[in-house]
């Protein structure tokens, strides 16, 4: 099982909890989701609780993260979209922290679970729909009627727009899930090559050099992917929120 590259994604029960025939067990995925929230919140608290006129390096990282998301949201959804800053910032920090924790050996990568990423995506799209109808009423439906479309093509275009909108949770969740899953499997495969070849003595160790180099290179790449996937999720969230704030802008 240790050589199985997919073994690292298995969800295992830590505490079995059954209520009315429904499984509410506390699993390793639950544990690392709690750890992710705790790590992100702890980092932000420790780096901002005693802010100085001259920021420390960690305080600078927190302030840069704040400005990074604030700028992204202003560009993506305008000044009116800033009311969603806590939501977008929390999503970005959760995904980034979860991705980085997943890079630690023997830690569980919660963003490699489609149920987790899909829940985050549904939360985003649900917020867009609820706020869109709350703010604009049925005017929110203008989102599905692009400007300048000939009347004869309007039914087809509206149908395409609705299907495209409803597919957003799928594309948003699968993008994050698939990238994290594929990256960790690839790392495991190359690390397995290193371990297997090293067992054959000096000759095997010589042959393990190339897989070792690839493993180190892929590890660096995965750290970059960890940030990029959190960034992409946040950018797309800002774009979708713009549809709720300005439904008739396209």
UniProtKB/Swiss-Prot annotation:
Q: What PROSITE patterns would the database entry show?
A: ATPASE_A
Question: What topology does it adopt in the membrane?
Answer: Multi-pass membrane protein
Q: Name the GO cellular-component terms.
A: plasma membrane; proton-transporting ATP synthase complex
HAMAP family attached to this UniProt entry: ATP_synth_a_bact (MF_01393)
Subcellular location per the Swiss-Prot or TrEMBL entry: Cell inner membrane
Q: How does it assemble?
A: F-type ATPases have 2 components, CF(1) - the catalytic core - and CF(0) - the membrane proton channel. CF(1) has five subunits: alpha(3), beta(3), gamma(1), delta(1), epsilon(1). CF(0) has three main subunits: a(1), b(2) and c(9-12). The alpha and beta chains form an alternating ring which encloses part of the gamma chain. CF(1) is attached to CF(0) by a central stalk formed by the gamma and epsilon chains, while a peripheral stalk is formed by the delta and b chains.
Give each disulfide bond as a residue pair: none
Pfam entry (one): ATP-synt_A
**Keywords associated with the record:** ATP synthesis, Cell inner membrane, Cell membrane, CF(0), Hydrogen ion transport, Ion transport, Membrane, Transmembrane, Transmembrane helix, Transport
Q: What sections of the protein cross the membrane?
A: 26-46, 84-104, 114-134, 143-163, 193-213, 216-236
Give the residue range of the signal peptide: none
Is Membrane there in the keyword field?
yes
- This protein's major location comes to membrane
The record's section on NCBIfam families has: ATP_synt_6_or_A (TIGR01131), PRK05815.2-4 (NF004482)
Is Acetylation included in the keywords of this UniProt record? Answer: no
Q: Which family does it belong to?
A: Belongs to the ATPase A chain family.
Q: Tell me which InterPro entries the record gives.
A: ATP_synth_F0_asu, ATP_synth_F0_asu_AS, ATP_synth_F0_asu_bact/mt, F0_ATP_A_sf
Molecular functions per Gene Ontology: proton-transporting ATP synthase activity, rotational mechanism
The record describes the protein's role as:
Key component of the proton channel; it plays a direct role in the translocation of protons across the membrane.
Q: What is this protein called?
A: ATP synthase subunit a
């Amino acid at each position: 099982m240790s050589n199985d590259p997919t073994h690292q994604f298995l969800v295992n029960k830590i505490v079995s909890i059954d209520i009315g025939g429904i499984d509410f067990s506390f699993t390793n995925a639950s544990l690392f989701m709690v750890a992710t929230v705790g790590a992100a919140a702890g980092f932000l608290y420790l780096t901002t609780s005693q802010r100085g006129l001259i920021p420390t390096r960690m305080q600078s990282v927190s302030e840069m993260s704040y400005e990074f998301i604030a700028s992204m949201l202003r560009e993506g959804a305008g000044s009116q979209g800033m009311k969603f800053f806590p939501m977008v910032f929390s999503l970005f920090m959760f995904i980034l922290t979860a991705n980085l924790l997943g890079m630690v050996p023997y830690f569980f990568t919660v963003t490699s679970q489609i149920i987790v990423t899909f829940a985050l995506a549904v939360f985003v799209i649900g917020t867009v729909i609820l706020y869109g109808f709350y703010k604009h009423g049925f005017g929110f439906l203008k989102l599905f009627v692009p400007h300048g479309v000939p009347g004869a093509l309007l039914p087809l275009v509206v149908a395409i727009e609705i299907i495209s909108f409803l597919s957003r949770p799928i594309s948003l969740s699968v993008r994050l899930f698939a990238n994290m899953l594929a990256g960790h499997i690839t790392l495991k495969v190359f690390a397995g090559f290193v371990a297997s070849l090293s067992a054959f003595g000096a000759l095997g160790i010589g042959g393990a050099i190339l897989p070792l180099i690839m493993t180190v290179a892929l590890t660096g790449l995965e750290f970059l992917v960890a940030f990029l996937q959190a960034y992409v999720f946040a950018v797309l969230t800002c774009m979708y929120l713009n549809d709720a704030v300005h439904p008739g802008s396209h």
